[in-house]
């Protein structure tokens, strides 16, 4: 079933709202990309958006562009440590903006939106040894 992002057809009282027009294609939404940590390769999907433009969705991520002090480095993603968007996402290795990922050079926090941008950008987290 399609995801419709138009106005609700119910009033606050529970009564029906009768629309003066049909539903429009531009009001349709999509399922979330749910970018996972890939096993052997990266997988992207190109989708058509409003106005005939294109959006690149990252379905499986293998590498992340990790930045530290203005320098960037392409490193391999090992797994998802924590995800504040949904605690189940960490178990399922789903990457979203704000997720903490384990990389080859340490933990990093994701700053990009992989399902919207098609790339994983992250900033290295300073580890404090106590």
Curated annotation (Swiss-Prot):
One GO cellular component term noted in the UniProt record for this chain: cytosolic small ribosomal subunit
Database matches in Gene3D superfamilies: 2.40.10.310
Keywords of the record: Ribonucleoprotein, Ribosomal protein
Keyword Ribonucleoprotein applies: yes
Disulfide bridges in this chain: none
Listed GO MF terms: structural constituent of ribosome
CDD domains according to UniProt: Ribosomal_S8e
InterPro entries hit by this protein: Ribosomal_eS8 (IPR001047), Ribosomal_eS8_CS (IPR018283), Ribosomal_protein_eS8_arc (IPR020919), Ribosomal_Se8/biogenesis_NSA2 (IPR022309)
One protein family per Pfam: Ribosomal_S8e
GO biological processes: maturation of SSU-rRNA from tricistronic rRNA transcript (SSU-rRNA, 5.8S rRNA, LSU-rRNA); translation
Highest taxon listed in the record's lineage: Archaea
Xref: HAMAP family: Ribosomal_eS8
Family membership noted in the UniProt record: Belongs to the eukaryotic ribosomal protein eS8 family.
Subunit structure: Part of the 30S ribosomal subunit.
Name of protein: Small ribosomal subunit protein eS8
């Amino acid at each position: 079933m399609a995801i419709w992002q138009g106005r609700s057809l119910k009033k606050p009282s529970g009564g029906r709202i009768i629309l003066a027009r049909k539903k429009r294609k531009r009001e349709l939404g999509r399922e979330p990309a749910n970018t996972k940590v890939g096993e052997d390769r990266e997988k992207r999907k190109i989708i058509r958006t409003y106005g005939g433009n294109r959006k690149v969705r990252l379905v499986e991520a293998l590498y992340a562009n990790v930045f530290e002090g203005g320098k960037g480095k392409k490193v391999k993603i090992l797994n998802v440590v924590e995800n504040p968007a949904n605690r189940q996402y960490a178990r399922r290795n789903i990457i979203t903006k704000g997720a903490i990922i384990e990389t080859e050079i340490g933990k990093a926090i994701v700053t990009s939106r992989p399902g919207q941008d098609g790339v994983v950008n992250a900033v290295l987290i300073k580890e404090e040894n106590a």
